[in-house]
Structure formats: C-alpha cells, structure tokens
C-alpha cells in the first residue's frame, strides 16, 4: 500500500495493468489505485474490481460509471476482442485471431502497446486496434518464448486491412 502511495504521488503519467491470472486472482484489483492515467484489465479483473459475477460487458461498463474509476480504461475480452471505455463513449475492436495457441502474456502484450500509444497518440480506436493485433499475434506462440517482430505486426495489419 505504501509503495502505491509513493508511485501515485511521484509519477504524473501512471499506466496500470491489472490482468488477473491463477497466481494473483483477488489480489490485483484496480481499486487499490486512485491515481492513474490509463488502465488495462481483463474481464475477470473488471468483475473483481466491481465486486460482481455479472458477465455482460455492457452491464459492467454501466456499473463502472457508478463507481470511482479513472478514464480511459481498456478491458480485454479474449476471443471477443477488447473495449476502450471513456467518460462519454465506448469503442469496441474485435479479435482478429481466433485459433490461438497460448494466451499467456497476451494481456501484457496488449498493455505494452496500448499504454505507450495512449501516452503519445490520442487516437484511441487505432490504439485499441494495434493492441488487439499485437496481443493476438503473441497468442500464436507458446508462452513468452518469442516476441512479435515489427515485420510480423506490419504484415498482419496489412492483411487485416485488405
């Protein structure tokens, strides 16, 4: 808790990644943090932070607007894609890879791209699209053994946009 306070006090652009997994479930809630500029989480983490078992993403988004949460935030939805929630709108981007091999690290890959782009470029739909493509490519490999290259990313983007 003390480290969180130190970070929030001394860093003015704070991106937060809280993807729940089997090792940290129930311990990594976004509600522990008060000051951040961007939040990325999976649907399970979204449910945990809102203290609900509700599965409908639209209901969860509506419920989040009644709770204290900073905008923008992104929720990864696995094979369904992801959604970026801002104060006045939500933007959904589908998944482009449906035959994944291993999703370990995909949330981290999504966060790496979207948090960096959120800092430098404010086209949130483009950021979400690139995050989904990068995370989807990452899920085509076992574990974190191989990182997606710039060429693989460019080739996939061109293929999707054709």
List each language-model region with its residue ranges:
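Non-cysteine beta-strand/loop elements that form the S-adenosyl-L-methionine
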Residues: 35-44
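Conserved phosphate-binding/catalytic region of the ribokinase-like
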Residues: 2-36, 50-162
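Nucleotide phosphate-binding site architecture
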Residues: 47
């Amino acid at each position: 808790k003390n480290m969180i306070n130190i970070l929030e006090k001394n860093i003015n652009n704070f991106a937060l990644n809280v993807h729940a997994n089997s090792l940290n479930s129930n311990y990594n809630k976004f509600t522990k943090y008060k000051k951040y500029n961007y939040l990325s989480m999976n649907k399970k983490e979204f449910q945990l932070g809102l203290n609900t078992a509700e599965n409908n993403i639209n209901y969860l988004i509506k419920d989040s607007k009644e709770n204290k949460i900073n905008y923008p935030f992104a929720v990864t939805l696995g094979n369904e894609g992801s959604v970026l929630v801002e104060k006045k709108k939500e933007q959904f981007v589908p998944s482009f890879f449906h035959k994944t091999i291993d999703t370990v690290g995909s949330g981290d890959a999504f966060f790496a791209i979207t948090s960096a782009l959120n800092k430098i470029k404010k086209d949130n739909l483009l950021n979400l699209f690139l995050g989904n493509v990068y995370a989807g490519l990452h899920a085509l490999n076992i574990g974190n053994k191989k990182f997606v290259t710039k060429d693989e990313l460019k080739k996939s983007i061109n293929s999707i946009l054709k």
